[in-house]
Amino acid sequence: MAHEILIAETEAFLKNVAPETRTAIISAITGGKSACKSAAKLIKNEHLPLMSGEATTMHIVMRCLYPEIKPWKKASDMLNKATSSLKKSEGRDIRKQMKAAGDFLGVESMMKMRAFRDDQIMEMVEEVYDHPDDYTPDIRIGTITAWLRCKNKKSERYRSNVSESGRTALKIHEVRKASTAMNEIAGITGLGEEALSLQRQTESLAILCNHTFGSNIMRPHLEKAIKGVEGRVGEMGRMAMKWLVVIIYFSITSQPASACNLKTCLKLFNNTDAVTVHCFNENQGYMLTLASLGLGIITMLYLLVKIIIELVNGFVLGRWERWCGDIKTTIMPEIDSMEKDIALSRERLDLGEDAPDETDNSPIPFSNDGIFEI
């Protein structure tokens, strides 16, 4: 039963793929070990017209069916990145539950009962992909089938469940709210031009999101654009905090000076009454000194805590390697992969819905041991 559900969910996942490509992949999955290994090699060498996400997903499915297929670095990196925020204790607990689940129904119930987050589900997928021999075929097939079902449900426009495109729209809405708040702060902090630029960017993203709603094609590129805008919002927030420090000093120094000090200042600078001159009195000097000491102590404590956290993340949790990978990805992005995805998406849009569906809908044969055969 799990095999048949896997085929159905795989076909649903590949619904935007060209019919001949979808048929070739399904035939390979149902054609036994050798056919699956050949298809996995074609996917790894990018000889099939698949998006980056589609290719890695299909390779994961094939390796979980047949552990003899060697892991693909691109798929492993994707899984590592998806589970990087997961705690080790959560990972251990998930592995125990997986081994006790037994089959597809148990795995699916486990995901639903525990209301697993995306990173927890990806931890399960990573386990059966990295260590397939540690789990029974039922658990491996059940895990990837339940994972595909989750992906397919999120890609559809359900009213009860927010789709991935809907989540993207919500993120853009949050960014727009943040940019509006920054625009209001701009009156005090002098960030008006930056706030207006940010608002224009978020409006453009909102329009783009509306055009691509319900589509899996451009979502990764939208996510990257949103992260860029979120980074701008964060930077503007930090600038606003710096202006807050200036405002604290200004609130201290803006107290009325005594008549004696004002006269002294006017005599010293030989100014007329038309020029406003501020001289610090003794109380204001004490307040400025205390404010400077307080801000200095807070800054030093913050830096000390930050250094300790970074050391723990680096030496104990081993996150430095992942950060280096993220920096490398930012500095040297996969331009070729992005261009390939965009070109393929245009080709699919040009093809339209009039293309004949050549999917082989004949009954799927099985051997006595439950393995697919032609």
Curated annotation (Swiss-Prot):
A lipid is attached at residue 324 (S-palmitoyl cysteine). Residues 263-288 are extracellular. The record marks 259-260 as: Cleavage. The keyword Lipoprotein applies. Glycans are attached at residue 270. GO terms for cellular component: host cell endoplasmic reticulum membrane; host cell plasma membrane; membrane; viral capsid; virion membrane. Residues 1-242, 310-374 are cytoplasmic. GO terms for biological process: monoatomic ion transmembrane transport. One of its GO terms (molecular function) is channel activity. Coiled coil: none annotated. Pfam families: CM1, CM2. Palmitoylated. It comes from the Viruses. The chain crosses the membrane at residues 243-262, 289-309. Ion channel, which might have a role in genome packaging and uncoating processes. This is Polyprotein p42. The lineage of its organism: Viruses, Riboviria, Orthornavirae, Negarnaviricota, Polyploviricotina.
